[in-house]
Design a protein with these regions (language model features):
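N-terminal assembly/interaction segments in proteins that build large macromolecular machines
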Residues: 2-308
Length: 308
């Protein structure tokens, strides 16, 4: 039975075993997926194969800056207890280092790249990590910035990770500026970086909502169109302040009063240079992953029935 590269990828996702071993298993089993899983188990990878079927919805997001490169990764495990363990945290940091050092195009490329301080690939290292850490592990996503200046921030032990990219001039150290921007992003999760990014469709929808609300308000319904338009403009400014990073009120009012945009300009000027916000990525660990809801009563009943 023939098999494809997609089959190798599927088997790797099912078992967390290295790509080469998965390919070998499919060759040995003539492309039969079930037999390939059993073959891998027989070769001593049973623990990793069994754990790979579990839902990994906990974990950690981690940001790293190294040698001018910034990397942000999310790695998932099964339990919050595991996510706080030293072994898991060290593994996540190694994955971030692998991203920074290897410049992989995607997760598949990352899995086939060299694991830090090892002759093995990330994929080849995974089974041992799954067994030593004791849970299913999934490298979910990453981003890498190789240009400009990157600053990372990790909130609440890795529940949220942010990587900010800045264009810095004047030879200044913009780390503190970047960290404060990252904290703002972590706390408020803006939809847009700047109001210039808000599309016409979004603006039209917001204006439509504002006008509809006025039409349902007896005090506003009969106001002249010009008055309504001014009110709508005021609401749009409020929309920018609530949804666009640069137009937001800077959260650290203890060090600056004003918008994020003004804070960046003011802080850079005081340092004798200039800073321009380029891009950022925010990961909230486990977002979008459906967690398994345990029914312990049903589980016990099932186990009792199995014993009959």
């Amino acid at each position: 039975m023939a098999f494809t590269a997609a089959d190798v990828k599927t088997l790797r996702e099912m078992t967390s075993v290295g790509m080469m071993d998965c390919k070998k298993a499919l060759v040995e089993c003539d492309g039969d997926m079930d037999k390939a899983v059993e073959w891998l188990r027989e070769k001593g990878l049973a623990k990793a194969a069994k754990k790979a079927g579990r839902i990994a919805a906990e974990g950690m997001s981690y940001a790293l800056t190294e040698n001018g490169v910034g990397a942000l990764v999310e790695v998932n495990c099964e339990t919050d207890f595991c996510a706080k363990s030293d072994l898991f945290v060290a593994f996540v940091k190694d994955i971030a280092k692998a991203v920074a050092e290897n410049d992989p195009a995607d997760v598949d490329a990352l899995m086939n790249s060299k694991y830090p301080d090892s002759e093995l690939t990330v994929s080849e290292t995974m089974p041992e990590k799954v067994m030593s850490i004791g849970e299913n592990l999934q490298v979910r996503r990453f981003v890498r910035f190789a240009e400009n200046t990157s600053v990372g921030y990790v909130h609440a032990g890795g529940k949220i990770g942010v990587l900010v990219n800045l264009a810095v001039e004047g030879g200044i150290d913009a780390t503190e500026i970047g960290k404060n921007i990252a904290m703002q992003i972590a706390a408020l999760n803006p939809r847009f970086w700047d109001k210039s990014q808000v599309t016409e469709d979004v603006l039209a929808e917001e204006k439509k909502i504002a006008l509809a609300l006025m039409d349902t308000d007896p005090k506003m319904a009969n106001k002249p169109a010009q008055v309504k338009e001014k009110i709508v403009m005021g609401k749009m400014n409020k929309f920018y302040e609530e949804n666009c990073l640069m137009q937001m009120e800077f959260v650290r009012g203890d060090i600056f009063q004003g918008t994020v945009e003004k804070y960046v300009a003011d802080a850079a000027k005081k340092l004798g240079g200039s800073v321009k916000f380029v891009d950022a990525v925010r990961y909230q660990t486990g977002e979008g992953i459906e967690k398994k809801q345990e029914d312990f009563a049903a589980e016990v009943a099932a186990q009792m029935n199995m014993g009959k």
